[in-house]
């Protein structure tokens, strides 16, 4: 198991409405990268659960790539997912992560050629993130058979890392289905939507359950 902590960004291209909204709320509340790293540090002080940051390259460039990964590691972060930084084009990110002891987790999609899946597996560490659909987070999975075929094929190519699947996974049934070949499933938008509903309804008792 691991926890994924989002790094708010004003233009989260891969995200659906739930995470776009959460980013807007965080940014309008004044959340900075330093604040996000402090949240990670506070979490690490009370938990050994692996912690993964997910965000975008631009705020990290502004922060300073090397400084970011060093500070992430000292804050207890185990890995980083950057959907808009392909590992081949973002070699500086990859090297900075490696030097700091932070996993650089790359993504593949149903449209990713087999030879590139193999290359991404070689470059990545932690796990390879298999995007279930060509779209944004929180989208409907639709027909699952093409996704299962894609995951089965991807699993045969990914030899160096666990294969995790995400995007559009909402229910326990989704998790069971998607992990027939993947090593695990990532639930993001569904949880963010639940948190928003609880926050707007002030439903503390439901949150506790």
Predicted regions and their residues:
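Catalytic beta/alpha-barrel core
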Residues: 28-31, 76-89, 103-112, 137-140
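Alpha-helix-loop-beta-strand connector modules within alpha/beta enzyme cores
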Residues: 16-52, 95-105, 109, 145-163, ...
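Glycine-rich beta-to-alpha transition loops that act as phosphate-gripper elements at the mouths
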Residues: 54-62, 86-87, 108-112, 164-172
């Amino acid at each position: 198991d691991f926890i994924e902590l989002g790094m708010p960004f004003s233009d989260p291209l891969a995200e659906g409405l739930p995470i776009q909204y959460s980013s807007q709320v965080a940014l309008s509340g004044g959340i900075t990268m330093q604040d996000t790293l402090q949240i990670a540090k506070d979490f690490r002080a009370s938990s050994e659960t692996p912690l993964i940051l997910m965000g975008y390259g631009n705020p990290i460039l502004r922060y300073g790539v090397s400084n970011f990964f060093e500070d992430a590691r000292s804050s207890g972060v185990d890995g980083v997912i950057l959907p808009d930084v392909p590992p081949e084009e973002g070699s500086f990110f990859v090297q900075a992560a490696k030097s700091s002891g932070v996993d650089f987790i790359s993504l593949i999609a149903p449209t990713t050629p087999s030879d590139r899946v193999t290359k991404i597996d070689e470059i990545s560490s932690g796990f390879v993130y298999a995007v279930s659909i060509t779209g944004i987070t929180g989208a409907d999975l639709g027909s699952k058979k093409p996704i299962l075929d894609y995951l089965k094929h991807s699993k045969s190519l990914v030899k160096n890392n666990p294969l995790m699947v995400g995007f559009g996974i909402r229910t326990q049934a989704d998790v069971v289905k998607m992990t027939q070949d993947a090593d695990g499933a990532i639930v993001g938008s569904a949880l963010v939507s639940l948190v928003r509903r609880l926050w707007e309804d002030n439903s503390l008792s439901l949150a506790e359950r």
